[in-house]
């Protein structure tokens, strides 16, 4: 089906272009959401008559998204979740959670604007892409940790999955005095 795009759609085209799309995509997504019109003579003249208002509305949306992007871009958010000793989360951080975190900070972002290929399932620093407008894309950082103190340590570059980081204990001090380590330096091969 041929449609006239009423706004820029990534990987499809710019506003005003006539593009060929699958019937289901047009009927179930583009037409109901007002992102496109069927490409016929009547709709082409209608689009040309409304082109100036559509461009003004698109520019207004883009400027609003750019204002939010200027505040959010590169910002870091702390996410406290339960996790095991290896750093594996008991659950995950999904797009829904990112939206809730941003809403708590006063930003109104839709779930469809958060681009996570897979949910976050481990503690650490994770970059998340936000598509605020078809032409405005930013990244925020999620600092996923077991506590606020760990998040602070993690933001300074500390590794939190070792025994020392978890318990505050030196691993070497836990070894018995007569512990034999075949990989340690100074072991004479004749003795072994």
UniProtKB/Swiss-Prot annotation:
Assigned keywords, A-Z: Ribonucleoprotein, Ribosomal protein, RNA-binding, rRNA-binding
Pfam family of the protein (one): Ribosomal_L9_N
Similarity comment: Belongs to the bacterial ribosomal protein bL9 family.
Disordered as annotated region, ranges: 172-192
Function: Binds to the 23S rRNA.
Protein name, per record: Large ribosomal subunit protein bL9
Domain of life: Bacteria
Source organism of this protein record: Rhizobium leguminosarum bv. trifolii (strain WSM2304)
GO cellular component: ribonucleoprotein complex; ribosome
Coiled coil, from the record: none
Organism phylogeny: Bacteria, Pseudomonadati, Pseudomonadota, Alphaproteobacteria, Hyphomicrobiales
Gene: rplI
Family matches, as HAMAP family: Ribosomal_bL9
PANTHER family for this protein: 50S RIBOSOMAL PROTEIN L9
Bilayer-crossing regions: none
Keyword Translocase: no
GO process terms (BP): translation
InterPro entries hit by this protein: Ribosomal_bL9 (IPR000244), Ribosomal_bL9/RNase_H1_N (IPR009027), Ribosomal_bL9_bac/chp (IPR020594), Ribosomal_bL9_C (IPR020069), Ribosomal_bL9_C_sf (IPR036791), Ribosomal_bL9_N (IPR020070), Ribosomal_bL9_N_sf (IPR036935)
Listed SUPFAM superfamilies: L9 N-domain-like, Ribosomal protein L9 C-domain
GO MF entry, a single one: structural constituent of ribosome
Keyword Acetylation in record: no
Extent of Acidic residues compositional bias: 179-192
């Amino acid at each position: 089906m041929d449609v006239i795009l009423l706004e820029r759609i990534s990987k499809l085209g710019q506003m005003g272009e006539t593009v060929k799309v699958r019937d289901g995509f047009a009927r179930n997504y583009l037409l109901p959401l007002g992102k496109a019109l069927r490409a016929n003579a009547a709709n082409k003249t209608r689009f040309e008559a409304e082109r100036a208002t559509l461009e003004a509305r698109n520019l207004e949306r883009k400027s609003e998204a750019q204002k939010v992007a200027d505040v959010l871009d590169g910002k870091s958010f702390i996410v406290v979740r339960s996790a095991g000793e290896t750093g594996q989360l008991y659950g995950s951080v999904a797009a829904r959670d990112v939206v809730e975190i941003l809403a708590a900070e006063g930003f109104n972002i839709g779930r469809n604007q958060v681009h996570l290929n897979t949910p976050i399932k481990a503690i650490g620093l994770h970059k998340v892409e936000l598509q605020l407008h078809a032409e405005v894309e930013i990244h925020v950082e999620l600092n996923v940790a077991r506590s606020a103190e760990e998040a602070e340590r993690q933001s300074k570059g500390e590794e939190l999955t070792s025994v020392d980081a978890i318990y505050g204990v030196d691993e070497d001090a836990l070894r018995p005095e007569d512990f034999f380590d075949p990989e340690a330096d100074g072991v004479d091969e004749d003795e072994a």
